[in-house]
Amino acid sequence: MTTCLRLFFRILSPIRIGCVKLRRLMFPPQAISPVLTAVAMACLAHGVVWAQSTVASTQLPTGGVVSAGQASISQAGSTLNVNQTSQRAIVDWSSFNVGQNATVNFQQPNAQSSTLNRVMDMQPSQILGRITAPGQVILVNPQGVYFGKSSSVDVGGLVATTHTAVADEYLKGQLKFNRNGATGKVENEGELRAALGGFIALLAPEVRNSGVIVANLGTVALAAGEAYELQFDGSGALSNVRVTPATINTLVENKHAIMAPGGLVILSAQAASRLQ
């Protein structure tokens, strides 16, 4: 029997969603109000230990190869620029870490542009510095993605996930992701900011936010499951995340601020059986 909890918040004014933790739960539709109370009380204050190597303050992504679309990669000091001329591009990286004093700029044609970054490293990506883009940045690392306390991401839209993107669908404009055995996690302790009407989506078997996520008139999605499909409305806004239940333990935890005035917040943790 599938167990799940999906919460949708339509935000009419700035809101701070404090401590929310979801772990393979199931409630009937009529129990939604009690669920909100139970989830709010379920927060446990505990840290997360990441098995990760030290990242130099000026560290930048390495080994970038453009495998689809048109883009070039250049570096000047502690700044790396991805100069993209096509609407969509796929870049494969040997590693994707951004040091505290480093910056990665995705120079895309417009706000509807998108760059899929596939990381081949055997270690989680550590984002401790700055990432900017007018359009969408999609960061895929099966080992995990960590946004440190010093990180600052300012983009049109962001997906950080451990799940593999379906490349053919991506190039057609669809955002679909499959776990393919990945067990890494995505955690934010920094500041993730989407452009007006944009989105921030953190997708992994385990998702934690103890930082700040901002998407004015946009969408914030924290989701845990086996597969995901991001669905957009006619205006291009993220309106839903379709989550396939996972075959492993899943968890979504929010311990700090999600601000989406006039927008939507989606929290979804789904698994294929009850937590024992």
PLM regions: where:
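Extracellular and secretory-pathway beta-repeat/beta-biased strand scaffolds
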Residues: T2-Q276
